[in-house]
Protein backbone atom coordinates (compact mmCIF):
# COMPACT_ATOMS: atom_id res chain seq x y z
CA UNK A 1 0.00 0.00 0.00
CA UNK A 2 1.20 3.46 -0.79
CA UNK A 3 -0.26 6.87 -1.46
CA UNK A 4 0.29 7.70 -5.09
CA UNK A 5 -0.40 11.21 -6.38
CA UNK A 6 0.18 11.72 -10.06
CA UNK A 7 -0.16 14.97 -12.04
CA UNK A 8 -2.75 16.24 -9.61
CA UNK A 9 -4.25 19.67 -10.26
CA UNK A 10 -7.00 21.37 -8.28
CA UNK A 11 -8.71 24.65 -9.11
CA UNK A 12 -10.60 27.04 -6.87
CA UNK A 13 -12.70 28.76 -9.51
CA UNK A 14 -10.22 30.50 -11.80
CA UNK A 15 -7.29 30.03 -9.43
CA UNK A 16 -5.09 26.96 -9.71
CA UNK A 17 -4.44 25.93 -6.11
CA UNK A 18 -2.46 22.80 -6.91
CA UNK A 19 -0.50 22.43 -10.11
CA UNK A 20 0.52 19.10 -11.60
CA UNK A 21 1.62 17.56 -8.32
CA UNK A 22 3.26 14.13 -8.26
CA UNK A 23 4.65 12.23 -5.28
CA UNK A 24 4.51 8.89 -3.57
CA UNK A 25 4.23 8.21 0.15
CA UNK A 26 5.38 4.72 1.06
CA UNK A 27 3.53 2.72 3.67
CA UNK A 28 4.41 3.47 7.32
CA UNK A 29 6.27 6.63 6.39
CA UNK A 30 5.58 9.96 8.01
CA UNK A 31 5.65 12.61 5.33
CA UNK A 32 5.51 16.33 6.04
CA UNK A 33 4.22 18.76 3.44
CA UNK A 34 5.47 22.24 4.26
CA UNK A 35 5.09 25.62 2.64
CA UNK A 36 3.75 29.09 3.24
CA UNK A 37 0.12 30.11 3.53
CA UNK A 38 -1.61 29.61 0.20
CA UNK A 39 0.87 27.01 -1.00
CA UNK A 40 -1.99 24.56 -1.52
CA UNK A 41 -1.32 22.34 1.48
CA UNK A 42 -4.85 22.23 2.86
CA UNK A 43 -6.26 21.93 -0.65
CA UNK A 44 -4.10 18.85 -1.19
CA UNK A 45 -5.48 17.13 1.91
CA UNK A 46 -9.06 18.18 1.21
CA UNK A 47 -8.76 16.71 -2.26
CA UNK A 48 -7.27 13.45 -1.01
CA UNK A 49 -10.04 13.00 1.57
CA UNK A 50 -12.80 13.64 -0.96
CA UNK A 51 -14.01 17.00 0.35
CA UNK A 52 -13.24 18.86 -2.88
CA UNK A 53 -12.95 17.60 -6.46
CA UNK A 54 -9.72 17.50 -8.43
CA UNK A 55 -9.48 19.04 -11.88
CA UNK A 56 -6.91 16.68 -13.32
CA UNK A 57 -4.64 13.83 -12.38
CA UNK A 58 -4.78 10.76 -10.21
CA UNK A 59 -4.55 9.96 -6.54
CA UNK A 60 -4.88 6.56 -4.96
CA UNK A 61 -4.35 4.77 -1.69
CA UNK A 62 -3.57 1.14 -2.51
CA UNK A 63 -6.29 0.14 -4.91
CA UNK A 64 -8.67 2.90 -3.81
CA UNK A 65 -9.10 5.82 -6.16
CA UNK A 66 -9.17 8.84 -3.86
CA UNK A 67 -10.64 11.13 -6.49
CA UNK A 68 -13.82 9.11 -6.70
CA UNK A 69 -16.59 9.00 -4.13
CA UNK A 70 -17.48 11.11 -1.13
CA UNK A 71 -15.43 11.81 1.98
CA UNK A 72 -17.73 9.68 4.14
CA UNK A 73 -16.79 6.67 2.01
CA UNK A 74 -13.05 7.38 1.94
CA UNK A 75 -12.91 6.89 5.69
CA UNK A 76 -14.31 3.39 5.17
CA UNK A 77 -11.37 2.68 2.87
CA UNK A 78 -8.85 3.53 5.56
CA UNK A 79 -8.29 7.25 4.98
CA UNK A 80 -8.84 9.53 7.99
CA UNK A 81 -8.53 13.29 7.74
CA UNK A 82 -8.13 15.70 10.66
CA UNK A 83 -9.08 18.99 9.07
CA UNK A 84 -7.57 22.34 9.93
CA UNK A 85 -8.39 24.03 13.21
CA UNK A 86 -8.95 21.36 15.88
CA UNK A 87 -11.65 19.47 14.12
CA UNK A 88 -13.87 18.44 16.98
CA UNK A 89 -17.56 19.14 17.45
CA UNK A 90 -17.73 21.54 20.42
CA UNK A 91 -21.37 20.78 21.28
CA UNK A 92 -20.73 17.07 21.69
CA UNK A 93 -18.99 15.47 24.64
CA UNK A 94 -15.46 14.12 24.35
CA UNK A 95 -16.80 10.57 24.29
CA UNK A 96 -19.39 11.39 21.62
CA UNK A 97 -16.68 12.98 19.48
CA UNK A 98 -14.64 9.81 19.75
CA UNK A 99 -17.59 7.50 19.13
CA UNK A 100 -18.49 9.50 16.04
CA UNK A 101 -15.35 8.27 14.30
CA UNK A 102 -16.38 4.65 14.74
CA UNK A 103 -20.15 4.82 14.15
CA UNK A 104 -19.78 3.32 10.69
CA UNK A 105 -17.78 0.36 11.95
CA UNK A 106 -19.84 -2.82 12.06
CA UNK A 107 -17.68 -4.66 14.57
CA UNK A 108 -18.40 -2.90 17.85
CA UNK A 109 -15.93 -5.08 19.79
CA UNK A 110 -13.10 -3.89 17.56
CA UNK A 111 -14.32 -0.32 17.87
CA UNK A 112 -14.23 -0.65 21.67
CA UNK A 113 -10.69 -1.96 21.44
CA UNK A 114 -9.72 1.05 19.32
CA UNK A 115 -11.28 3.35 21.89
CA UNK A 116 -9.22 1.73 24.61
CA UNK A 117 -6.10 2.25 22.51
CA UNK A 118 -6.97 5.92 21.87
CA UNK A 119 -7.60 6.56 25.57
CA UNK A 120 -4.27 4.94 26.45
CA UNK A 121 -2.64 7.23 23.92
CA UNK A 122 -4.45 10.29 25.32
CA UNK A 123 -5.22 9.61 29.00
CA UNK A 124 -6.33 13.25 29.42
CA UNK A 125 -9.30 12.54 27.17
CA UNK A 126 -10.25 9.59 29.37
CA UNK A 127 -10.54 11.93 32.35
CA UNK A 128 -12.84 14.22 30.41
CA UNK A 129 -15.13 11.79 28.58
CA UNK A 130 -18.40 13.41 29.70
CA UNK A 131 -17.23 17.02 29.21
CA UNK A 132 -18.29 19.02 26.18
CA UNK A 133 -15.68 19.50 23.46
CA UNK A 134 -15.61 23.24 24.00
CA UNK A 135 -14.44 22.88 27.60
CA UNK A 136 -11.11 21.44 26.45
CA UNK A 137 -7.86 23.35 26.02
CA UNK A 138 -6.45 23.84 22.53
CA UNK A 139 -4.00 20.99 22.92
CA UNK A 140 -6.65 18.64 24.29
CA UNK A 141 -8.93 19.50 21.40
CA UNK A 142 -6.21 18.61 18.94
CA UNK A 143 -5.70 15.30 20.77
CA UNK A 144 -9.44 14.70 20.55
CA UNK A 145 -9.42 15.47 16.83
CA UNK A 146 -6.59 13.01 16.25
CA UNK A 147 -8.27 10.51 18.57
CA UNK A 148 -11.50 10.76 16.59
CA UNK A 149 -9.59 10.11 13.36
CA UNK A 150 -7.88 7.08 14.92
CA UNK A 151 -11.30 5.73 15.98
CA UNK A 152 -11.92 5.02 12.30
CA UNK A 153 -8.90 2.70 12.37
CA UNK A 154 -7.21 4.39 9.44
CA UNK A 155 -4.29 3.14 7.41
CA UNK A 156 -3.58 6.60 6.04
CA UNK A 157 -3.85 9.56 8.39
CA UNK A 158 -4.06 13.06 6.90
CA UNK A 159 -3.25 15.79 9.42
CA UNK A 160 -3.88 19.43 8.58
CA UNK A 161 -1.87 21.89 10.71
CA UNK A 162 -2.13 20.16 14.08
CA UNK A 163 0.12 22.86 15.60
CA UNK A 164 -2.15 25.74 14.58
CA UNK A 165 -2.84 28.16 17.41
CA UNK A 166 -1.13 26.07 20.09
CA UNK A 167 1.49 27.17 22.62
CA UNK A 168 5.06 26.11 21.71
CA UNK A 169 5.27 23.55 24.49
CA UNK A 170 1.97 21.98 23.45
CA UNK A 171 3.08 21.97 19.81
CA UNK A 172 6.13 19.95 20.79
CA UNK A 173 3.92 17.47 22.64
CA UNK A 174 1.55 17.07 19.70
CA UNK A 175 4.42 16.52 17.26
CA UNK A 176 5.99 13.98 19.60
CA UNK A 177 2.65 12.17 19.89
CA UNK A 178 2.30 12.04 16.12
CA UNK A 179 5.80 10.57 15.83
CA UNK A 180 4.96 8.03 18.56
CA UNK A 181 1.77 6.98 16.81
CA UNK A 182 3.68 6.51 13.56
CA UNK A 183 6.37 4.49 15.33
CA UNK A 184 4.03 2.18 17.17
CA UNK A 185 1.49 1.45 14.45
CA UNK A 186 1.18 0.58 10.78
CA UNK A 187 -0.07 4.07 10.01
CA UNK A 188 1.07 6.07 7.05
CA UNK A 189 0.91 9.77 7.91
CA UNK A 190 0.71 12.77 5.64
CA UNK A 191 1.23 15.86 7.77
CA UNK A 192 0.68 19.35 6.43
CA UNK A 193 2.34 22.15 8.41
CA UNK A 194 3.27 25.79 8.39
CA UNK A 195 5.55 25.03 11.32
CA UNK A 196 8.11 23.68 8.85
CA UNK A 197 10.94 22.98 11.26
CA UNK A 198 8.77 21.16 13.78
CA UNK A 199 7.21 19.03 11.08
CA UNK A 200 10.46 18.18 9.29
CA UNK A 201 12.08 17.17 12.56
CA UNK A 202 9.59 14.36 13.11
CA UNK A 203 9.05 13.42 9.46
CA UNK A 204 10.81 10.79 7.39
CA UNK A 205 10.16 12.56 4.12
CA UNK A 206 9.58 16.24 3.42
CA UNK A 207 7.70 17.84 0.54
CA UNK A 208 8.06 21.59 0.02
CA UNK A 209 5.16 23.26 -1.73
CA UNK A 210 5.09 26.74 -3.18
CA UNK A 211 2.08 28.20 -4.99
CA UNK A 212 0.76 24.75 -5.82
CA UNK A 213 4.07 23.39 -7.12
CA UNK A 214 6.58 21.03 -5.54
CA UNK A 215 9.82 22.90 -4.94
CA UNK A 216 11.72 20.16 -3.16
CA UNK A 217 11.14 16.59 -2.02
CA UNK A 218 13.40 14.23 -0.12
CA UNK A 219 14.41 12.80 3.23
CA UNK A 220 13.55 15.46 5.77
CA UNK A 221 17.07 15.43 7.24
CA UNK A 222 18.41 16.41 3.81
CA UNK A 223 15.88 19.21 3.52
CA UNK A 224 16.81 20.55 6.94
CA UNK A 225 20.47 20.50 5.87
CA UNK A 226 19.83 22.24 2.54
CA UNK A 227 20.88 25.92 2.84
CA UNK A 228 18.36 27.13 0.24
CA UNK A 229 15.45 25.41 2.01
CA UNK A 230 16.70 26.65 5.36
CA UNK A 231 16.77 30.22 4.14
CA UNK A 232 13.41 30.14 2.39
CA UNK A 233 11.31 27.94 4.69
CA UNK A 234 13.01 27.34 7.99
CA UNK A 235 13.83 30.95 8.72
CA UNK A 236 17.56 30.79 9.29
CA UNK B 1 -58.38 29.13 42.11
CA UNK B 2 -60.56 27.48 39.48
CA UNK B 3 -59.40 30.10 37.03
CA UNK B 4 -55.79 29.39 37.85
CA UNK B 5 -56.22 25.63 37.41
CA UNK B 6 -58.10 26.09 34.15
CA UNK B 7 -55.54 28.51 32.76
CA UNK B 8 -52.65 26.20 33.68
CA UNK B 9 -54.28 23.08 32.24
CA UNK B 10 -55.26 24.73 28.97
CA UNK B 11 -51.85 26.34 28.77
CA UNK B 12 -50.26 22.94 29.20
CA UNK B 13 -52.38 21.35 26.49
CA UNK B 14 -51.88 24.18 24.00
CA UNK B 15 -48.23 24.44 24.95
CA UNK B 16 -47.72 20.74 24.22
CA UNK B 17 -49.09 21.21 20.70
CA UNK B 18 -46.96 24.29 20.05
CA UNK B 19 -43.92 22.51 21.49
CA UNK B 20 -44.26 19.55 19.13
CA UNK B 21 -44.82 21.82 16.15
CA UNK B 22 -41.78 23.85 17.19
CA UNK B 23 -39.76 20.66 17.51
CA UNK B 24 -40.72 19.72 13.95
CA UNK B 25 -39.48 23.10 12.69
CA UNK B 26 -36.31 22.95 14.80
CA UNK B 27 -35.40 19.46 13.55
CA UNK B 28 -35.44 20.70 9.97
CA UNK B 29 -33.80 24.04 10.68
CA UNK B 30 -30.88 22.75 12.65
CA UNK B 31 -30.02 19.98 10.24
CA UNK B 32 -30.53 21.78 6.93
CA UNK B 33 -30.95 25.50 7.78
CA UNK B 34 -34.33 25.51 6.07
CA UNK B 35 -37.14 27.56 7.60
CA UNK B 36 -39.84 25.16 6.51
CA UNK B 37 -43.13 26.94 5.82
CA UNK B 38 -44.43 23.76 4.23
CA UNK B 39 -44.53 22.13 7.66
CA UNK B 40 -48.18 23.15 8.17
CA UNK B 41 -49.09 21.72 4.77
CA UNK B 42 -47.21 18.50 5.41
CA UNK B 43 -48.99 18.12 8.75
CA UNK B 44 -52.31 18.83 7.03
CA UNK B 45 -51.81 16.20 4.30
CA UNK B 46 -50.68 13.67 6.92
CA UNK B 47 -53.76 14.46 8.99
CA UNK B 48 -55.97 13.79 5.93
CA UNK B 49 -54.24 10.40 5.66
CA UNK B 50 -55.02 9.87 9.34
CA UNK B 51 -58.63 10.94 8.68
CA UNK B 52 -58.89 8.44 5.80
CA UNK B 53 -57.66 5.69 8.08
CA UNK B 54 -59.92 6.64 10.96
CA UNK B 55 -63.04 6.83 8.76
CA UNK B 56 -62.26 3.37 7.35
CA UNK B 57 -61.07 1.54 10.44
CA UNK B 58 -62.77 3.63 13.10
CA UNK B 59 -59.57 3.22 15.05
CA UNK B 60 -57.65 6.33 16.11
CA UNK B 61 -54.73 4.25 17.35
CA UNK B 62 -54.07 3.00 13.82
CA UNK B 63 -54.63 6.45 12.33
CA UNK B 64 -52.01 8.13 14.54
CA UNK B 65 -49.02 5.99 13.48
CA UNK B 66 -50.30 5.86 9.89
CA UNK B 67 -50.34 9.66 9.74
CA UNK B 68 -46.90 9.83 11.36
CA UNK B 69 -45.55 7.42 8.76
CA UNK B 70 -47.15 9.39 5.92
CA UNK B 71 -45.70 12.60 7.36
CA UNK B 72 -42.24 11.06 7.57
CA UNK B 73 -42.43 9.80 3.99
CA UNK B 74 -43.70 13.10 2.60
CA UNK B 75 -40.94 15.03 4.38
CA UNK B 76 -38.27 12.61 3.15
CA UNK B 77 -39.53 13.05 -0.42
CA UNK B 78 -39.49 16.86 -0.16
CA UNK B 79 -35.95 16.81 1.25
CA UNK B 80 -34.56 14.32 -1.23
CA UNK B 81 -36.11 15.58 -4.43
CA UNK B 82 -36.43 19.30 -3.78
CA UNK B 83 -34.42 20.71 -0.88
CA UNK B 84 -31.20 18.73 -1.40
CA UNK B 85 -30.81 19.49 -5.13
CA UNK B 86 -31.84 23.07 -4.41
CA UNK B 87 -29.17 23.49 -1.72
CA UNK B 88 -26.55 22.26 -4.21
CA UNK B 89 -27.70 24.31 -7.17
CA UNK B 90 -28.74 27.56 -5.50
CA UNK B 91 -25.74 27.76 -3.19
CA UNK B 92 -24.30 31.01 -4.55
CA UNK B 93 -25.47 34.55 -5.07
CA UNK B 94 -28.38 36.55 -3.77
CA UNK B 95 -30.79 33.64 -4.04
CA UNK B 96 -28.81 31.32 -1.75
CA UNK B 97 -30.18 32.41 1.65
CA UNK B 98 -33.80 32.64 0.50
CA UNK B 99 -34.08 29.85 -2.07
CA UNK B 100 -35.16 27.21 0.43
CA UNK B 101 -37.65 29.54 2.15
CA UNK B 102 -39.32 30.40 -1.15
CA UNK B 103 -39.30 26.76 -2.16
CA UNK B 104 -40.97 25.79 1.12
CA UNK B 105 -43.68 28.40 0.51
CA UNK B 106 -44.13 26.88 -2.93
CA UNK B 107 -44.49 23.42 -1.42
CA UNK B 108 -47.08 24.80 1.02
CA UNK B 109 -49.06 26.15 -1.92
CA UNK B 110 -48.84 22.86 -3.79
CA UNK B 111 -49.96 20.92 -0.71
CA UNK B 112 -52.88 23.34 -0.13
CA UNK B 113 -54.20 23.06 -3.65
CA UNK B 114 -53.38 19.36 -3.93
CA UNK B 115 -55.39 18.66 -0.77
CA UNK B 116 -58.23 20.82 -2.02
CA UNK B 117 -58.31 18.82 -5.27
CA UNK B 118 -58.28 15.45 -3.53
CA UNK B 119 -60.42 16.14 -0.46
CA UNK B 120 -62.17 19.39 -1.52
CA UNK B 121 -62.20 22.44 0.74
CA UNK B 122 -65.24 21.13 2.56
CA UNK B 123 -64.52 20.70 6.26
CA UNK B 124 -64.20 17.11 7.44
CA UNK B 125 -65.13 16.05 10.93
CA UNK B 126 -62.33 14.14 12.62
CA UNK B 127 -63.78 11.93 15.36
CA UNK B 128 -61.97 12.10 18.67
CA UNK B 129 -61.22 8.80 20.40
CA UNK B 130 -61.98 10.39 23.77
CA UNK B 131 -64.38 12.98 25.12
CA UNK B 132 -63.76 16.57 24.06
CA UNK B 133 -66.09 17.95 26.72
CA UNK B 134 -64.80 19.73 29.78
CA UNK B 135 -64.09 17.60 32.81
CA UNK B 136 -66.58 18.02 35.63
CA UNK B 137 -65.33 18.01 39.18
CA UNK B 138 -68.06 18.62 41.76
CA UNK B 139 -70.19 21.38 40.34
CA UNK B 140 -67.49 23.07 38.26
CA UNK B 141 -66.81 22.23 34.65
CA UNK B 142 -63.18 22.81 33.72
CA UNK B 143 -62.43 23.82 30.12
CA UNK B 144 -60.10 20.85 29.96
CA UNK B 145 -61.07 17.54 28.39
CA UNK B 146 -59.87 14.00 28.07
CA UNK B 147 -58.71 15.00 24.61
CA UNK B 148 -56.43 17.57 26.24
CA UNK B 149 -55.03 14.89 28.50
CA UNK B 150 -54.45 12.72 25.45
CA UNK B 151 -52.57 15.59 23.80
CA UNK B 152 -50.36 16.24 26.81
CA UNK B 153 -49.51 12.60 27.43
CA UNK B 154 -48.86 11.82 23.76
CA UNK B 155 -46.61 14.85 23.35
CA UNK B 156 -44.67 13.95 26.49
CA UNK B 157 -44.21 10.37 25.24
CA UNK B 158 -43.15 11.54 21.77
CA UNK B 159 -40.69 14.06 23.26
CA UNK B 160 -39.19 11.38 25.51
CA UNK B 161 -38.79 9.03 22.55
CA UNK B 162 -37.07 11.79 20.58
CA UNK B 163 -34.81 12.66 23.52
CA UNK B 164 -33.84 9.02 23.96
CA UNK B 165 -33.23 8.63 20.25
CA UNK B 166 -31.03 11.71 19.98
CA UNK B 167 -29.05 11.24 23.19
CA UNK B 168 -28.71 7.48 23.43
CA UNK B 169 -28.55 5.97 19.95
CA UNK B 170 -25.83 5.94 17.31
CA UNK B 171 -28.15 7.32 14.66
CA UNK B 172 -29.16 10.10 17.05
CA UNK B 173 -25.50 10.97 17.54
CA UNK B 174 -24.99 11.08 13.76
CA UNK B 175 -27.97 13.43 13.43
CA UNK B 176 -26.67 15.81 16.07
CA UNK B 177 -23.13 15.74 14.69
CA UNK B 178 -24.28 16.33 11.11
CA UNK B 179 -26.44 19.22 12.27
CA UNK B 180 -23.56 20.97 14.03
CA UNK B 181 -20.57 20.21 11.81
CA UNK B 182 -21.43 18.51 8.52
CA UNK B 183 -17.85 18.51 7.26
CA UNK B 184 -16.29 16.98 10.36
CA UNK B 185 -19.14 14.46 10.42
CA UNK B 186 -18.39 13.50 6.82
CA UNK B 187 -14.73 13.01 7.66
CA UNK B 188 -15.78 10.80 10.55
CA UNK B 189 -17.78 8.65 8.14
CA UNK B 190 -21.31 9.94 8.74
CA UNK B 191 -23.42 9.76 5.58
CA UNK B 192 -24.63 13.31 5.99
CA UNK B 193 -27.15 13.33 3.13
CA UNK B 194 -28.86 10.22 4.42
CA UNK B 195 -28.87 11.51 7.97
CA UNK B 196 -30.46 14.80 6.85
CA UNK B 197 -33.26 12.92 5.14
CA UNK B 198 -33.87 11.06 8.39
CA UNK B 199 -33.99 14.40 10.23
CA UNK B 200 -36.64 15.65 7.84
CA UNK B 201 -38.59 12.42 8.18
CA UNK B 202 -38.63 12.72 11.97
CA UNK B 203 -39.78 16.29 11.65
CA UNK B 204 -42.54 15.25 9.25
CA UNK B 205 -43.69 12.58 11.69
CA UNK B 206 -43.75 15.10 14.57
CA UNK B 207 -45.82 17.53 12.47
CA UNK B 208 -48.23 14.76 11.52
CA UNK B 209 -48.72 13.81 15.16
CA UNK B 210 -49.51 17.48 15.90
CA UNK B 211 -52.23 17.43 13.22
CA UNK B 212 -53.78 14.19 14.39
CA UNK B 213 -53.74 15.36 18.02
CA UNK B 214 -55.14 18.82 17.51
CA UNK B 215 -57.79 18.12 14.85
CA UNK B 216 -60.14 15.62 16.61
CA UNK B 217 -63.19 17.30 17.98
CA UNK B 218 -62.91 20.00 15.34
CA UNK B 219 -62.79 20.14 11.57
CA UNK B 220 -60.09 19.43 9.04
CA UNK B 221 -59.62 21.56 5.93
CA UNK B 222 -56.63 22.27 3.68
CA UNK B 223 -55.96 25.44 5.69
CA UNK B 224 -56.97 24.37 9.18
CA UNK B 225 -53.42 23.79 10.46
CA UNK B 226 -51.80 26.92 9.00
CA UNK B 227 -52.18 28.92 12.21
CA UNK B 228 -50.06 26.31 14.00
CA UNK B 229 -47.16 27.31 11.78
CA UNK B 230 -47.23 30.77 13.37
CA UNK B 231 -47.43 29.41 16.91
CA UNK B 232 -44.82 26.78 16.15
CA UNK B 233 -42.39 29.39 14.80
CA UNK B 234 -42.90 31.68 17.76
CA UNK B 235 -42.26 28.78 20.14
CA UNK B 236 -39.20 27.70 18.13
CA UNK B 237 -37.76 31.23 18.13
CA UNK B 238 -38.32 31.56 21.88
CA UNK B 239 -36.27 28.40 22.26
CA UNK B 240 -33.51 29.59 19.96
CA UNK B 241 -34.53 27.75 16.74
CA UNK B 242 -31.86 25.10 17.20
CA UNK B 243 -32.58 23.39 20.46
CA UNK B 244 -35.20 20.63 20.96
CA UNK B 245 -35.31 21.47 24.67
CA UNK B 246 -35.78 25.11 23.72
CA UNK B 247 -38.67 24.16 21.44
CA UNK B 248 -40.38 22.34 24.31
CA UNK B 249 -39.90 25.25 26.68
CA UNK B 250 -40.88 27.80 24.01
CA UNK B 251 -44.11 25.91 23.36
CA UNK B 252 -44.92 25.83 27.04
CA UNK B 253 -44.21 29.54 27.52
CA UNK B 254 -46.39 30.42 24.53
CA UNK B 255 -49.22 28.10 25.58
CA UNK B 256 -49.25 29.52 29.08
CA UNK B 257 -49.13 33.14 27.92
CA UNK B 258 -52.06 32.50 25.60
CA UNK B 259 -54.24 30.73 28.13
CA UNK B 260 -53.52 33.15 30.98
CA UNK B 261 -54.18 36.16 28.76
CA UNK B 262 -57.44 34.75 27.45
CA UNK B 263 -58.71 33.72 30.90
CA UNK B 264 -57.44 36.64 33.00
CA UNK B 265 -57.52 39.47 30.47
CA UNK B 266 -59.58 38.92 27.36
CA UNK B 267 -59.98 36.12 24.87
CA UNK B 268 -59.94 38.79 22.17
CA UNK B 269 -56.21 39.21 22.73
CA UNK B 270 -55.23 35.67 21.79
CA UNK B 271 -54.19 36.63 18.27
CA UNK B 272 -51.93 39.39 19.51
CA UNK B 273 -50.20 37.51 22.30
CA UNK B 274 -47.91 35.31 20.20
CA UNK B 275 -46.64 38.33 18.30
CA UNK B 276 -46.08 40.34 21.46
CA UNK B 277 -44.16 37.41 22.95
CA UNK B 278 -42.19 37.03 19.71
CA UNK B 279 -41.28 40.72 19.53
CA UNK B 280 -40.26 40.76 23.19
CA UNK B 281 -37.98 37.77 22.67
CA UNK B 282 -36.50 39.20 19.47
CA UNK B 283 -35.72 42.51 21.15
CA UNK B 284 -34.62 41.28 24.57
CA UNK B 285 -32.95 37.98 23.70
CA UNK B 286 -32.86 37.58 19.93
CA UNK B 287 -30.98 34.29 20.06
CA UNK B 288 -33.74 32.74 22.13
CA UNK B 289 -33.54 31.16 25.53
CA UNK B 290 -31.45 28.18 24.44
CA UNK B 291 -29.91 29.78 21.38
CA UNK B 292 -26.63 31.23 20.35
CA UNK B 293 -23.03 30.24 19.89
CA UNK B 294 -21.48 28.09 22.53
CA UNK B 295 -24.61 27.69 24.56
CA UNK B 296 -26.44 25.74 21.92
CA UNK B 297 -27.52 22.35 23.11
CA UNK B 298 -26.57 19.05 21.67
Model-derived regions, located:
Chain A
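Conserved structural motif at the start of ABC-family nucleotide-binding domains
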Residues: 3-5, 18
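Helical segment within the ABC ATPase nucleotide-binding domain
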Residues: 172-186
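Conserved ABC ATPase signature
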Residues: 132-136, 140
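Conserved ABC transporter NBD signature motif
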Residues: 57-65, 77, 110-115
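Helix-to-loop junction immediately C-terminal to a conserved catalytic motif
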Residues: 49
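The feature captures the beta-strand-to-loop junction immediately N-terminal to the Walker
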Residues: 34-36
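ABC-type ATPase nucleotide-binding domains, specifically the catalytic core motifs of the NBD
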Residues: 13, 31, 94-112, 121-126, ...
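ABC ATPase C-loop
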Residues: 149-150
Amino acid sequence: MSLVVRNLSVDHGAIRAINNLSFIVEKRRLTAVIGANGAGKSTLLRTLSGLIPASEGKASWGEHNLLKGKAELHVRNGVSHVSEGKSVIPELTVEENLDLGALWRKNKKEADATKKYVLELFPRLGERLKQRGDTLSGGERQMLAIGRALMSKPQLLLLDEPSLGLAPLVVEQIFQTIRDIANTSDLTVLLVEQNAMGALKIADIGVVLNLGNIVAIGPSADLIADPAIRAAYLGY
Amino acid sequence: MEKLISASLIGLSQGAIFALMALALVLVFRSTRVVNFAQAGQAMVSTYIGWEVVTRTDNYWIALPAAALAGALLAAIIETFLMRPLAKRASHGAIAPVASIIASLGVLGVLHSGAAMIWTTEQKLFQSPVSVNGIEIGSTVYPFSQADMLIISTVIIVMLIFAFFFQRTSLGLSLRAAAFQPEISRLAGVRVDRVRTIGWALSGAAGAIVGVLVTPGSYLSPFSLDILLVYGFVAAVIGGLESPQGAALGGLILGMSLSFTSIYVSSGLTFIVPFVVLLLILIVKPKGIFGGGNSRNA
